């Protein structure tokens, strides 16, 4: 069972996943805007469709994982992402790590449009259908290339240059 909590630690969302078969279910009364997640102290957020994909990704890329934030949407709805970004205004870069299928691609396009403009958005496409498949089949993936494609959906806005004033351009006036 994967549990999502609010800021006070109260459980607000729960998702059950079977270990032997493909059973998955959200518990009745769960609020998807409070997802299973981990908040690091950095300004990067990695977004996944499900908790198992989030954990699989961390297993594949464990170095400094605690410094980043991770969020499982519980599908492809943007409710959880909207809440997270409204509470974590310091987020500067969002990595959309959704499945490598049509639904995942369409959701990335939609979610990217809803992310505030001052945040960079990058799509990481897994080398298999999802990140759990990548983890389970990592030995079959050549050169450990677990990310099939990196797509920049939005760059970070660049600061406007400050005009330079040269001393030769200044007119000296005696007072």
Model region roles, listed by residue range:
Residues 59-175:
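TOPRIM fold recognition
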Residues 1-87:
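Phosphate-handling DNA/RNA-contact segment within nucleic-acid enzymes
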């Amino acid at each position: 069972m994967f549990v999502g909590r609010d800021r006070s630690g109260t459980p607000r969302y729960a998702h059950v996943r079977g270990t032997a078969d493909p059973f998955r279910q959200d518990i009745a009364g769960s609020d998807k805007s409070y997802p299973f997640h981990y908040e690091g102290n950095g300004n990067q957020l990695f977004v996944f469709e499900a908790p198992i994909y989030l954990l699989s990704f961390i297993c594949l890329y464990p170095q400094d994982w605690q410094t980043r934030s991770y969020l499982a949407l519980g599908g492809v709805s943007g409710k959880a992402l909207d809440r997270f970004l409204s509470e974590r205004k310091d987020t500067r870069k969002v990595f959309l790590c959704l499945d490598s299928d049509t639904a995942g691609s369409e959701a990335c396009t939609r979610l990217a449009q809803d992310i505030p403009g001052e945040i960079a958005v990058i799509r990481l496409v897994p080398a298999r259908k999802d990140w759990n498949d990548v983890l389970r089949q990592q030995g079959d993936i050549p050169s450990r290339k677990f990310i099939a494609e990196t797509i920049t959906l939005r760059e970070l806005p660049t600061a406007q240059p400050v005009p330079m004033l040269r001393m030769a351009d200044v007119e000296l006036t005696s007072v």
